[in-house]
């Protein structure tokens, strides 16, 4: 668990830096699993950027883990237009959607036997990079001014036709609105 007041207000970059520092401090790893995105910023960028800070491969939108080995993991990932099967070398980081797995609740006996004292809490002083200017709001190259839902628009147009016809129609709309 990484927790310190100086981590507050972090954007994607500062959050990813914080996570990578905590992961490095935790020791060796083979596979890091991250959720696809958060409910606050909803950017789906923290996992990939954390992997970049760690210098390891990453796979996004993982639908299923097909095979694991000592040095690799084979996954199915959603690339929006197609589903791709990819064999990735370990260590790597994968971002998964909430539907990739349904976690089981521990049994009563197992809950009684859990050692909750084994959860280590790390703060700024426990990390390799102890510069508070690299974390939280101070370490964030971007700052959110405000978050709001977009206005609902009812003036949408659905176009049908061949690729050429659609391209011509789209160009006409862009010209009409002086985008081109």
What is each PLM-predicted segment?
Residues 1-180:
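N-terminal glycine-rich FAD/FM-binding segment characteristic of electron-transfer flavoproteins
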């Amino acid at each position: 668990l990484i927790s310190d007041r100086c981590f507050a207000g972090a954007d994607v970059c500062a959050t990813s830096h914080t996570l990578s520092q905590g992961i490095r401090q935790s020791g060796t790893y083979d596979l890091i699993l991250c959720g696809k995105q958060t409910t606050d910023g909803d950017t789906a960028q923290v996992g990939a950027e954390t992997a970049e800070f760690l210098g390891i491969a990453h796979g996004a939108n993982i639908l299923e883990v097909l095979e694991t080995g000592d040095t690799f993991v084979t996954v199915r990932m959603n690339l929006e237009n197609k589903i791709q099967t990819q064999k990735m070398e370990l260590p790597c980081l994968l971002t998964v959607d909430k539907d990739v797995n349904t976690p089981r609740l521990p049994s009563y006996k197992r809950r009684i036997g859990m050692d909750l004292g084994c959860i280590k809490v790390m703060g700024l002083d426990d990390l390799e990079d102890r510069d508070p200017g690299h974390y939280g709001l101070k370490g964030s190259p971007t700052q959110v001014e405000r978050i709001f839902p977009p206005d609902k628009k009812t003036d949408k147009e659905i176009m049908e036709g061949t690729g050429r016809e659609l391209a011509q129609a789209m160009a006409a709309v862009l010209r009409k609105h002086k985008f081109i």
